[in-house]
Amino acid sequence: PSDGIKRRTFLQTGGGAGLAAWAAPMLVMSRVWGANDTIGVGVIGPGRRGQQLMGDFNRLKGFQYVAVSDVNARRMDQVAVGKDWKKCQDFRALLELKEVDAVIVATPDHWHALNSIYACMAGKDVYVEKPMTLTIAEGRAMVNAARHYNCVVQCGSQQRSDARCRTGCEWVRNQRAGKVTV
């Protein structure tokens, strides 16, 4: 076993400081990374949430950001200032980069499925921000792509594993919070 992080472990423990990952089942590795291997990560959509996720992932070892993609060139330049990252306005160009092993998808919601499916088709593992998809059909297409291309796809759902959120849900369900109306 190596002291370095494994690509799939990276995805399972990423985002929100990895809170959701501890509750998630461990996935089987198809490739073990050696001690000198580094996971190259590309970020698709480095807006406010994308930058938060980048900060969360920075707590992990054994990876480095290698590329960033955003249709807003100014934002992309701001995020990559002083960094030796490739910049791609078209996310498909980022997916073609050999140095990218995995991607963080933090684009507007309606892009999540397409970005993730294309990433799987390119052989990249995916951490996608919620909502994972907007329709059942998109969800099925993502599952099919992940299975067909043997990729790990994890959807961020940190609030679902946060004790404060669970407690709040219990209060509402047990009517301890009073009658809740919308």
Where on the chain are the PLM-derived regions?
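N-terminal glycine-/serine-/threonine-rich beta1-alpha1-beta2 phosphate-ribose binding loop
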Residues: 1-128, 137-152
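A contiguous active-site-proximal alpha/beta segment in oxidoreductase catalytic domains
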Residues: 125, 133-182
